[in-house]
Amino acid sequence: MQTIEIGNKAELQACKFLHTQALEILAHNFKALPYGEIDIIALDKDTLIFIEVKYRSKTKFAQAEEMLTYSKQQKLVNSASIYLQHNPQYQDYQCRFDLIAINESNINWIKNAFGVI
C-alpha cells in the first residue's frame, strides 16, 4: 500500500473514532496553501479542533506521537489561520490543536497536543 493510501486509511479511521466521541467533522484534508493541509477539522460544542493524524505501522523505532515536529506545528497554526479567514463564522470559537496517533491498531487521542506558537 502506498503512503498516501495508508494516510487516507488512517484519517478515515480517525474520523470514525471522532464520530464515536460525538464530534462533528467539518472538513477533511483542508488545503491551506502554501502551508499544506489540515487532516481533520472538527467541532466539539463551542471548540473548533484542528487535528493532525499520525500513523505508524511499526513502533520499534518511534511512536506516532513523536512524529509531530515543531515545523509541522507551525504549518498547522498557519493553516488554521487560513481556515478561520475562509470561515468567519468560527472566528469567536475557542481553538485547539489535537493529535490522533495510531500505532499499529491503537488510537491515542491527545487533546491540546501543542499550544499556539
Swiss-Prot record:
<dbReference type="GO" id="GO:0003676">
    <property type="term" value="F:nucleic acid binding"/>
</dbReference>
<comment type="similarity">
    <text>Belongs to the UPF0102 family.</text>
</comment>
<dbReference type="InterPro" id="IPR011335">
    <property type="entry name" value="Restrct_endonuc-II-like"/>
</dbReference>
<dbReference type="InterPro" id="IPR011856">
    <property type="entry name" value="tRNA_endonuc-like_dom_sf"/>
</dbReference>
<dbReference type="Pfam" id="PF02021">
    <property type="entry name" value="UPF0102"/>
</dbReference>
<dbReference type="InterPro" id="IPR003509">
    <property type="entry name" value="UPF0102_YraN-like"/>
</dbReference>
<protein>
    <recommendedName>
        <fullName>UPF0102 protein FTT_0898c</fullName>
    </recommendedName>
</protein>
